[in-house]
């Protein structure tokens, strides 16, 4: 299992010139290895939305039909969210859960792969603290890498936890883990 210390050690050992651009490969390897250790039948694909104008990439498990991480350089989005499309996305997790965004629309998230069952009080509570910080960084044009990783405890599409992280230049980390139950 990855911890805040794992990320801090990776960041501390980085010796390049552009941590935001160059650390992604190491992070993807860590995320894939961590997920595969608990899900040996995983069939992971990378869904890179940069060609469509987004700055985000998603790792998705085809076998269990779930996103395992969303990451990228956040952008300050000013266009309105397509609430009709979001309303059409299934919400089978119960009344206490929202169709939560891994990456908030206001910082570049917006596709169906980005929606996931998220406890309502988390979605409008503690999860927003780091989202707001990232939105402000995006508004300022700060170059950072933002990631959100749903952590699953079984084969369902319901995450047990969410891990949020922001890697900033030169070598710093903002980090939080949230319970989703």
Feature annotation, model-predicted:
Residues 33-36, 43-181:
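Domain-level detector of nuclease and nuclease-like folds
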Residues 1-51:
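Long, non-catalytic terminal segments
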């Amino acid at each position: 299992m990855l911890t805040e210390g794992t990320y801090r050690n990776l960041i501390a050992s980085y010796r390049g010139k552009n941590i935001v651009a160059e650390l992604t490969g190491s992070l993807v390897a860590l995320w894939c290895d961590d997920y595969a250790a608990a899900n040996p039948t995983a069939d992971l694909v990378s869904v890179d939305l940069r060609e469509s104008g987004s700055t985000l990439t998603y790792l998705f498990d085809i076998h269990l039909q779930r996103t395992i991480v969303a990451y990228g350089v956040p952008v300050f989005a000013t266009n309105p969210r397509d609430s009709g499309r979001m309303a059409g996305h299934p919400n089978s997790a119960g009344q206490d859960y929202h169709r939560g965004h891994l990456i908030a629309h206001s910082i570049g998230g917006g596709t169906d792969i980005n929606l996931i069952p998220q406890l309502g009080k988390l979605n409008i509570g503690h999860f927003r603290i780091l989202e707001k910080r990232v939105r402000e960084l995006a508004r300022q044009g700060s170059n950072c890498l933002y990631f959100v990783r749903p952590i699953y405890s079984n084969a369902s599409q319901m995450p047990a936890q969410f891990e949020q992280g922001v890697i900033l230049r030169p070598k710093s980390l903002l980090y939080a883990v949230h319970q989703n139950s």
